[in-house]
């Protein structure tokens, strides 16, 4: 692949990620009533979480749909093995899936219920 083609592919990926951020922002604003600035911060944090969890473990804070607070350790390392295809963030429209280390199973949370995350190093 030439340098020019790689640059075009990288730009296309960035455009897709930006569109995804916009979709998540609209969802967060409509569901929670947050400002666009706060919604954008949340969307960016979810993107960085997804990027990190493909190769490592993270502590994730979020609310369940019933309102209970959750603080769990999660990862996406085994995603491709379990689902037989690679993780694609563009497929995340409203629900984020992850492997919960405590419960030893796949769990989800709604994007608008996400609070924060920290890497486990």
Label the predicted regions.
Residues 57-59, 95, 106:
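Short, acidic/polar N-cap/turn motifs at the starts of alpha helices
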Residues 81-82, 103-121:
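Structured surface patches comprising rigid loops and adjacent beta-strands/short helices at the edges
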Residues 64, 68-89:
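Acidic, low-complexity, intrinsically disordered interaction modules
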Residues 60-62, 96-101:
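SH3/SH3-like beta-barrel fold
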Residues 89-97:
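Short aromatic-glycine-enriched beta-strand elements
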Residues 2-68:
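Short glycine-rich, low-complexity segments
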């Amino acid at each position: 692949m030439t340098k020019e083609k790689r640059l075009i592919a990288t730009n296309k990926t960035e455009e897709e990620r930006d569109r995804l951020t916009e979709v998540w922002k609209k969802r967060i604003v409509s569901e929670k009533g947050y400002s666009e600035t706060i919604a954008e911060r949340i969307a960016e944090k979810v993107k960085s979480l997804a990027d990190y969890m493909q190769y490592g473990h993270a502590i994730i804070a979020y609310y369940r749909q019933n309102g209970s607070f959750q603080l769990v350790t999660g990862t996406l390392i085994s995603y491709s093995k379990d689902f037989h295809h690679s993780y694609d963030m563009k497929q995340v429209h409203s629900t984020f899936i992850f492997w919960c280390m405590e419960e030893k199973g796949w769990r989800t949370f709604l994007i608008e219920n996400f609070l924060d995350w920290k890497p486990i190093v």
